[in-house]
Design a protein with these regions (language model features):
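Cleavable N-terminal export/targeting peptides
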Residues: 1-23
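Residue-level signature of outer-membrane beta-barrel architecture
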Residues: 50-52, 86-88, 126, 140, ...
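Helix-adjacent hinge/juxtasegments
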Residues: 75-99
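Outer-membrane beta-barrel initiation region
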Residues: 21-56
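Solvent-exposed loop/turn segments connecting transmembrane beta-strands
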Residues: 34-44, 70-81, 109-115, 145-153
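Transmembrane beta-strand segments that form the barrel wall of outer-membrane beta-barrel proteins
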Residues: 25-35, 61-73, 96-105, 137-142
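Short loop/turn motifs that connect adjacent beta-strands in outer-membrane beta-barrel proteins
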Residues: 19-23, 53-64, 89-95, 131
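Outer-membrane beta-barrel "beta-signal"
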Residues: 44-48, 126, 151-164
């Protein structure tokens, strides 16, 4: 059932993407709950994120653009999110902080306290080839103490991004 939700999300993400605009897709994998104090909830995660580099807003604190994505873990936990990211460039190096609220379903994984969770992430990537980036991300997901519990999770991710 949870895998069906992810497939539906990915289908809708690809179906409603404008055909003529540039779209950046990020495929990633990593470790869910890297600081697993109880030693029972660490899992491998696999995800997809979409960013439209044409939809952006330049401000005095950076270039902001919307992101949408989701991941699933090998313990059937699912997180689907949409939010905003900023991008800062230093030559080939890209630094991308982001914030995204999302829907979390624990599956057989860690109970984060409620369905509404917030992800804050920092990604460092290198633009090796034209429109192709390889990166490392560190993220934290929690519910801001709005739930009955708020254990939070920290994740480490390796990503591959390509603009199509």
């Amino acid at each position: 059932m949870k895998l069906q939700k992810l497939y539906l999300f990915l289908f809708l993400l690809l179906f409603f993407t404008p055909v003529k605009s540039e779209n950046e897709y990020t495929f990633y994998s990593g470790i869910f709950d890297t600081i697993d104090k109880e030693k029972d909830d660490k899992a491998t995660l696999y995800g997809l994120e979409h960013n439209n580099p044409v939809l952006f807003k330049d401000t005095f604190i950076g270039r902001f653009s919307p992101i949408t994505g989701g991941f699933i873990t090998d313990k059937d936990s699912i997180f689907i999110y949409t939010g905003v990211q900023a991008q800062y460039e230093i030559g080939l190096l890209k630094i991308t902080p982001s914030f995204a609220p999302g829907y979390y379903e624990k599956g057989d994984g860690k109970d984060l306290g409620m369905a509404l969770e917030f992800q804050s992430k920092i990604k460092i990537s290198l633009d090796f080839f034209k429109d192709t980036k390889i990166g490392y991300s560190y993220s934290h997901i929690s519910n801001n103490d709005w739930g009955t519990i708020n254990p939070g999770v920290n994740n480490e991710i390796i990503s591959f991004s390509k603009i199509f």
